From Swiss-Prot:
This is Large ribosomal subunit protein bL28. One of its GO terms (molecular function) is structural constituent of ribosome. The keyword Amino-acid biosynthesis does not apply. Belongs to the bacterial ribosomal protein bL28 family. It comes from Pseudarthrobacter chlorophenolicus (strain ATCC 700700 / DSM 12829 / CIP 107037 / JCM 12360 / KCTC 9906 / NCIMB 13794 / A6). Keywords: Ribonucleoprotein, Ribosomal protein. One of its GO terms (cellular component) is ribonucleoprotein complex. It holds the Pfam family Ribosomal_L28. The gene is rpmB. GO terms for biological process: translation. Residues 1-31 are annotated as: Disordered. The keyword Lipid biosynthesis does not apply. InterPro entries: Ribosomal_bL28, Ribosomal_bL28/bL31-like_sf, Ribosomal_bL28_bact-type, Ribosomal_bL28_sf. Coiled coil: none annotated.
Length: 78
């Protein structure tokens, strides 16, 4: 599963994990991606989205219809 949020566009970040002795190792910071299924009244069907925790909060505030409309406007197939 790709670590990419369909709502916010959050992607993995890269950096270092630093030990107590300050030795650095490359690591990847993944967003908190969840697979969520929503009922979309305007489409009259369920839509499964890969969303981050922040994306879930965005859907709660803006509403699923507005979020799905913006995703479809970008040309993403649901």
């Amino acid at each position: 599963m790709a670590a990419h949020c369909q709502v916010t566009g959050a992607e993995p970040g890269f950096g270092h994990s630093i030990s107590h002795s300050h030795r650095r190792n490359k690591r990847r910071f993944d967003p908190n991606i969840q697979k969520k299924r929503y009922w979309v009244p305007s489409l009259r069907r369920n839509v499964t989205l890969q969303v981050s925790a922040r994306g879930i909060k965005t859907i709660d505030v803006r509403g699923i219809d507005a979020v799905v409309a913006s995703i479809l406007a970008r040309g993403v197939k649901l």
